[in-house]
């Protein structure tokens, strides 16, 4: 499909001119290049109809032709507002709703806010739609608390929306009088309805407030969360940690299949919503805490808390080394990493694999067709050091013991390095093997000088070598 806004430097859909199948192939290849070294990358999950999927829209008010109030989006790398009548990515009901907002605001003679002069009233309009419920929210962002003729505006908006065939569920005003790129202000007042809408996702109902974090592509979110819960291999007996949980969508989706769910989120309003969503859905085995995820899991791990499965869905900058260190201390059997940035995901997988986790699969999901963004669900399991593996041994001599046929010195060194980061010498390996009763050929541990000052294998390295020997079934 063609879009007139592309010629005006919209920048919202950089891949719109590319065939959708080619988009998917390019995104899948990107993930393979970044994550393929960790484990298999599954085929990307795309959409059947990759248009009109955005259930949330933010428009900025400006002055159009003839001084008429209009609204739109910022041009790429600019502060210029491009008027938008409709968008190939936005929910079509929300396109109609925005036209109604503009008409009602014009009727009330509201003026757009001018950042340079500090004059005018209307800054932005945020719209949400519950895809499954059809409920619509209008959030009007103003530069001052007083909305002149607020009741008349509400009446006019409901009338104009009705002309468009849209039933508005709630209207909220939020005040943002600061010089900032942040859209919503701190003060809110409900002008109509209850101040929130409902939507259904993966069998649960969620209350969405103006500030709620909620994935903008409903269809693909169900795919994403379905993959995440499947990757957890839940049996109903597990304690699950949902880190960076937002309003609790992943944790509550998993709650039906787990013994207990604990959600952690730094945004207090999101936690408030998560608790309310749990109550609304009758979920009694989920608890939510307002805390920094890294700090919370660090304290929990130090206190000896354990989790069988950890979901992690961090922001674009990814997780932290401290968080991953605490994951290793909690030693969950499985980790499911939901990522919106494959670059930071690759960085974090490097740390997780060093901590004894194996990447079973990475599955990209096209949450944002026609953009360059990629979501990925990565399934990890804790390596079992007693797991039996097949080793292809290259025998350099025939005179070896039964134990020596299990693994070469090089393989033992590589195992220790990969799982602990430690470098161990053949001398240290020989010393530990001798302690374990494994017969050595004389040249490995025999000193070359008389009265030698023999180096003793440090305790930390001895433990690591013993783990390697156990892994290779040598002790």
Regions found by a protein language model. Give the residues of each.
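Short cysteine clusters
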Residues: 3-6, 10-13, 340
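Short Lys/Arg-enriched helix C-cap and helix-to-coil transition segments
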Residues: 440-450
């Amino acid at each position: 499909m063609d879009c007139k806004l592309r010629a005006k430097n919209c920048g919202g859909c950089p891949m719109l001119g590319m065939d959708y199948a080619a988009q998917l192939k390019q995104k899948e290849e990107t993930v393979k290049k970044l994550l393929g070294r960790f484990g298999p990358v599954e085929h990307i999950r795309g959409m059947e109809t990759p248009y009109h999927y955005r259930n949330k829209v933010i428009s900025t008010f400006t002055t159009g032709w003839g001084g008429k109030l209009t609204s739109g989006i910022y041009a790429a790398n600019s502060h210029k507002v491009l008027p938008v009548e409709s968008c190939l990515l936005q929910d079509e009901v929300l396109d109609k709703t925005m036209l109604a907002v503009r008409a009602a605001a014009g009727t009330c003679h509201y003026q757009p806010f001018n950042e340079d002069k500090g004059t005018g009233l209307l800054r932005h309009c945020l719209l949400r739609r519950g895809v499954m419920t059809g409920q619509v929210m209008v959030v009007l962002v103003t530069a001052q608390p007083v909305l002149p003729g607020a009741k008349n505006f509400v009446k006019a908006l409901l009338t104009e929306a009705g002309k468009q065939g849209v039933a508005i569920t709630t209207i909220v005003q939020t005040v943002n009088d600061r010089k900032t790129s942040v859209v919503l202000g701190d003060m809110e007042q409900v002008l109509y309805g209850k101040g929130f809408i409902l939507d259904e996702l993966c069998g649960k109902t969620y209350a969405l407030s103006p500030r709620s974090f909620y994935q903008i592509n409903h269809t693909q979110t169900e795919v994403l969360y379905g993959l995440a819960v499947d990757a957890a291999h839940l049996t109903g007996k597990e304690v699950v940690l949902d880190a960076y949980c937002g309003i609790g969508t992943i944790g509550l989706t998993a709650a039906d299949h787990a013994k207990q769910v604990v959600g952690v989120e730094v945004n207090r309003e999101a936690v408030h919503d998560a608790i309310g969503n749990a109550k609304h859905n009758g979920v009694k085995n989920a608890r939510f805490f307002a805390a920094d995820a890294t700090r919370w899991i660090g304290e929990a791990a130090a206190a000896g808390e354990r989790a069988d499965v950890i979901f992690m869905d961090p922001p674009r900058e990814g997780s932290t080394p401290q968080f991953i260190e605490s994951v290793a201390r909690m030693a969950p059997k499985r980790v499911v990493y939901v990522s919106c940035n494959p670059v930071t995901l690759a960085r974090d997988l490097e740390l997780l694999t060093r901590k004894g986790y194996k990447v079973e699969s990475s599955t990209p999901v096209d949450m944002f067709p026609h953009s360059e963004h990629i979501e990925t669900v990565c399934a990890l399991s804790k390596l079992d050091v007693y797991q039996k593996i097949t080793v292809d041994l290259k025998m350099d001599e025939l005179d070896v013991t039964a134990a020596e046929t299990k693994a070469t010195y090089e393989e033992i060194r590589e195992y220790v390095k990969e799982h602990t980061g430690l470098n161990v010498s053949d001398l240290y390996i020989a010393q530990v093997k001798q302690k374990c009763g494994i017969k050595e050929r004389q040249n490995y541990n025999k000193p070359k000088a008389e009265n030698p000052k023999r180096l003793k294998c440090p305790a930390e390295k001895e433990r690591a070598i013993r783990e390697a020997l156990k892994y290779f079934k040598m002790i």
